[in-house]
C-alpha cells in the first residue's frame, strides 16, 4: 500500500487569486512593522512630557541594558548600588518628609478622637488624664453597660452599673470612675463579695500564726486576727540538753499565768532559771559555768560544787540573787591556781 506524505497543499488546494492576495498582504505587513514602531515612539515622545527625575531614571535603566560584553551579548548583573546623585538624595528626602507628615496627621486625628471620647465616658477629671488603653477599655464597658440597660429595659442598681464599667480597669481608673458617679470606692470594693475579703486579708496571715494570750493584750502593730489558736510555750532548753550529761528539769519556759512564788530569772528571754535550794546549786553552777565559757584550770570533776560571787559578770547582765557567799575564797583559789 502506497502512502503519500501529508501536505496541506494537496488536502486544501488554494486558488491562484487567493494565494497571490495573501502573499502580497504578508509582504506589506513585514514591511510596515519596522516603520510603524518608531513612529509610535516618536509620537509618544512628542505628546507626553516627562519629569526630569523620571528621565534620569529611564536613562540609567537604558544604560544598564545597553552594557554588553566583548562578544556582544548582554551581561547579567546582580543588585548593584545606584549612584547617589544630588537629585536622588533630594527625592529621597522629600519622600521621607511626606511620610512623616502623614504619620503626624494620623496621630493628631487619633488624639483628637480620644479627647472627644474622654469627654463622653463617665470619667472626666481636670487633674488626671486617662491613658489611651484605659480610655478604650472604659468606652467598651460603657457601651456594653448601656446595651444591657436597653436589653433589660430596667434601670440598674448604681453598684452593679459601676462594677460593669470597671471590669478590666486599673485601680486608679476604678477610683476615678467611682468618684465621678458619687460612689465611695471602699463601699464599691466591699460590694464585690469574695474579692473584698481577698483584698482586706493580710498577705502575712498565712505565714505567721495568730497572737493570743489570756493575760497579755494584743501587741501594737497586730490586728485582731483569728484567736482560735493560742500561743504555745516553747521549751528552749531542748537545744542545750545535748551539751550536758544531766538536763535541768526546771529549765523550761514559764506559762503566761505566772507562778505565785518568787519570779524566775530570765536569761534574756532564751530560757528561765528558778531559785533553788543550796543543795541543788551543783547542777545550776555547772550549767552556768559552761554557759560562761570559762575553762577551769584545776582538776575539777563533773559533779564539783562551788558558788560564784555576785560581782562576776555573766552574759546579758545576769546576776544570781539571794545566794550564800560561804565558799567565795575557795572559788577564787580555784581560778587563780
UniProtKB/Swiss-Prot annotation:
Spell out the SMART domains in the cross-references.
HLH
Enumerate the subcellular locations listed in this protein's record, separating them with semicolons. Answer: Nucleus
Q: Which InterPro entries match?
A: bHLH_dom, bHLH_transcription_factors, HLH_DNA-bd_sf, NeuroD_DUF, TF_bHLH_NeuroD
Q: Check the record and name the CDD domains matching this protein.
A: bHLH_TS_NeuroD6_ATOH2
PROSITE patterns (UniProt xref): BHLH
This protein's GO CC annotations: nucleus
Q: What does it do?
A: Activates E box-dependent transcription in collaboration with TCF3/E47. May be a trans-acting factor involved in the development and maintenance of the mammalian nervous system. Transactivates the promoter of its own gene.
Protein name, per record: Neurogenic differentiation factor 6
**What is the phylogenetic placement of the source species in the record?**
Eukaryota, Metazoa, Chordata, Craniata, Vertebrata
Amino acid at each position: 500500500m502506497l502512502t503519500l506524505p501529508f501536505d496541506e497543499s494537496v488536502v486544501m488546494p488554494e486558488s491562484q487569486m487567493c494565494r497571490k492576495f495573501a502573499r502580497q498582504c504578508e509582504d506589506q505587513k513585514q514591511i510596515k512593522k519596522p516603520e510603524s514602531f518608531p513612529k509610535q515612539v516618536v509620537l509618544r515622545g512628542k505628546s507626553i512630557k516627562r519629569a526630569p527625575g523620571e528621565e534620569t531614571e529611564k536613562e540609567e535603566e537604558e544604560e544598564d541594558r545597553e552594557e554588553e560584553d566583548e562578544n556582544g551579548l548582554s551581561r547579567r548583573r546582580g543588585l548593584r548600588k545606584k549612584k547617589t546623585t544630588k537629585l536622588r538624595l533630594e527625592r529621597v528626602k522629600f519622600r521621607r518628609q511626606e511620610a512623616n507628615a502623614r504619620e503626624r496627621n494620623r496621630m493628631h486625628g487619633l488624639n483628637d478622637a480620644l479627647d472627644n471620647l474622654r469627654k463622653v465616658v463617665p470619667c472626666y477629671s481636670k487633674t488626671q488624664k486617662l491613658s489611651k488603653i484605659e480610655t478604650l477599655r472604659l468606652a467598651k464597658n460603657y457601651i456594653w453597660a448601656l446595651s444591657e440597660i436597653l436589653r433589660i429595659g430596667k434601670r440598674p442598681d448604681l453598684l452593679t452599673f459601676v462594677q460593669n464599667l470597671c471590669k478590666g480597669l486599673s485601680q486608679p481608673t476604678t477610683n476615678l470612675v467611682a468618684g465621678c458617679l458619687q460612689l465611695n470606692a471602699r463601699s464599691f470594693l466591699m460590694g464585690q463579695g469574695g474579692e473584698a475579703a481577698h483584698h482586706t486579708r493580710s498577705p502575712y496571715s498565712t505565714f505567721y500564726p495568730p497572737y493570743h494570750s489570756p493575760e497579755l493584750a494584743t501587741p501594737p502593730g497586730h490586728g485582731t486576727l483569728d484567736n482560735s489558736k493560742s500561743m504555745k510555750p516553747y521549751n528552749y532548753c531542748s537545744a542545750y540538753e545535748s551539751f550536758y550529761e544531766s538536763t535541768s528539769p526546771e529549765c523550761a519556759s514559764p506559762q503566761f499565768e505566772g507562778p505565785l512564788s518568787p519570779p524566775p530569772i530570765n536569761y534574756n528571754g532564751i530560757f528561765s532559771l528558778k531559785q533553788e535550794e543550796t543543795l541543788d546549786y551543783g547542777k545550776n553552777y555547772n550549767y552556768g559555768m559552761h554557759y560562761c565559757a570559762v575553762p577551769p584550770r584545776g582538776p575539777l570533776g563533773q559533779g564539783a560544787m562551788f558558788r560564784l560571787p555576785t560581782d562576776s559578770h555573766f552574759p546579758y547582765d545576769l546576776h544570781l540573787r539571794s545566794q550564800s557567799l560561804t565558799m567565795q575564797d575557795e572559788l577564787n583559789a580555784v581560778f587563780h591556781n
